[in-house]
């Protein structure tokens, strides 16, 4: 073997660049990274300073990370209510995307609604679930008649409106069930309501507006105080003020 050939063999042989050399790069890190909170509220939740979502609702703290909801409500369920294509006319022609309507809830007084449009169905569903988690609200449940057992219905009549659709929720006796359309019934089931009558008016075929109207209606249950809540109570200090040092701690960067 001549000297040039031996030198080429030592370099890795003839052919493409770096061919024959051992791969020095390690395997790709396919493991999912843990949640690194970027907000003060997220740091307190991950540190265990805030253990219930009611503390967040009591002080009207904005939730910017969906992992907060996953931590405080581990039993949250999601349901895809509708997926439909939407089009936009452009110079190059019609651009088609997909809109997903998603509802999340724990069947124990918490429910959220998310709507997202994306190029792919899977991306629209994933983003819709995140938006629904960020929009989770509490539901005030009550009784029809005597206060026996666990709350099974709504405390009062409520009404919600979106577009031309108006949805009215009326408390019902125990055992009546949810008398509503399939979409609204699923929303109320995820909210934890067992017995309720519903009345809807307008273009109810527009499923998106119907769900929005029902979502506004059940959200209005906390829009006012019933007589049993008229007594003045001292407002506790916000967790952001109690744990201000832990909330302001930034992650060290090297």
Curated annotation (Swiss-Prot):
Residues 18-27 have a biased composition (Basic residues). InterPro entries: Ribosomal_Su5_D2-typ_SF, Ribosomal_uS5, Ribosomal_uS5_C, Ribosomal_uS5_euk/arc, Ribosomal_uS5_N, Ribosomal_uS5_N_CS, Ribsml_uS5_D2-typ_fold_subgr. Residues 1-10 have a biased composition (Polar residues). It holds the Pfam family Ribosomal_S5_C. It comes from the Eukaryota. N-terminally acetylated by acetyltransferase NatA. The modification Omega-N-methylarginine is found at residues 11, 17. Residues 76-139 form the S5 DRBM domain. The modification N-acetylserine is found at residue 2. There is a cross-link at residue 33 (Glycyl lysine isopeptide (Lys-Gly) (interchain with G-Cter in ubiquitin)). One of its GO terms (molecular function) is structural constituent of ribosome. GO terms for biological process: cytoplasmic translation; positive regulation of translational fidelity; ribosomal subunit export from nucleus; rRNA processing; translation. It is found in: Cytoplasm; Nucleus, Nucleolus. SUPFAM superfamilies: dsRNA-binding domain-like, Ribosomal protein S5 domain 2-like. Residues 1-34 are annotated as: Disordered. One of its GO terms (cellular component) is nucleoplasm. Keywords: Acetylation, Cytoplasm, Isopeptide bond, Methylation, Nucleus, Ribonucleoprotein, Ribosomal protein, Ribosome biogenesis, rRNA processing, Ubl conjugation. The modification Asymmetric dimethylarginine is found at residue 11. Gene3D superfamilies: 3.30.160.20, 3.30.230.10. Component of the small ribosomal subunit (SSU). Mature yeast ribosomes consist of a small (40S) and a large (60S) subunit. The 40S small subunit contains 1 molecule of ribosomal RNA (18S rRNA) and 33 different proteins (encoded by 57 genes). The large 60S subunit contains 3 rRNA molecules (25S, 5.8S and 5S rRNA) and 46 different proteins (encoded by 81 genes). Interacts with snoRNA U3. Interacts with MPP10. Component of the ribosomal small subunit (SSU) processome composed of at least 40 protein subunits and snoRNA U3. Component of the ribosome, a large ribonucleoprotein complex responsible for the synthesis of proteins in the cell. The small ribosomal subunit (SSU) binds messenger RNAs (mRNAs) and translates the encoded message by selecting cognate aminoacyl-transfer RNA (tRNA) molecules. The large subunit (LSU) contains the ribosomal catalytic site termed the peptidyl transferase center (PTC), which catalyzes the formation of peptide bonds, thereby polymerizing the amino acids delivered by tRNAs into a polypeptide chain. Belongs to the universal ribosomal protein uS5 family. This is Small ribosomal subunit protein uS5. The gene is RPS2.
């Amino acid at each position: 073997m001549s000297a040039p050939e031996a030198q080429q063999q030592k370099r890795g042989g003839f052919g493409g660049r770096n061919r024959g050399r051992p791969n020095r790069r390690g395997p790709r890190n396919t493991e999912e990274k843990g949640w690194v909170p970027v907000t003060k509220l997220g740091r307190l939740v991950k540190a265990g300073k805030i253990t219930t979502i009611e503390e967040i609702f009591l002080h009207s703290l904005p939730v910017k990370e969906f992992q907060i909801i996953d931590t405080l409500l581990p039993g949250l369920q999601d349901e895809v209510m509708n997926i439909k294509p939407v089009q936009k006319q452009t110079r190059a022609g019609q651009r088609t995307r997909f809109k997903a309507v998603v509802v999340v809830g724990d069947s124990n007084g918490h429910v959220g609604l998310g709507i997202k449009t994306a190029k792919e169905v899977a991306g629209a569903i994933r983003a819709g679930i995140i938006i629904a988690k960020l929009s989770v609200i509490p539901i005030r449940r009550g009784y029809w008649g005597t206060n026996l057992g666990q709350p099974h219905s709504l405390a009062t009549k409520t009404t919600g409106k979106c577009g031309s659709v108006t949805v009215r929720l009326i408390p019902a006796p125990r055992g009546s069930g949810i008398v509503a359309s399939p979409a609204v019934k699923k929303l109320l089931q995820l909210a934890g309501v067992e017995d309720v009558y519903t009345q809807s008016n307008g273009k109810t075929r527009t499923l998106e507006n119907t769900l929005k109207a029902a979502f506004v209606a059940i959200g209005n249950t906390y829009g006012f105080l019933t007589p049993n809540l008229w007594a003045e109570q001292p407002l506790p200090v916000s967790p952001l003020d109690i744990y201000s040092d832990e909330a302001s701690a930034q992650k060290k960067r090297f």
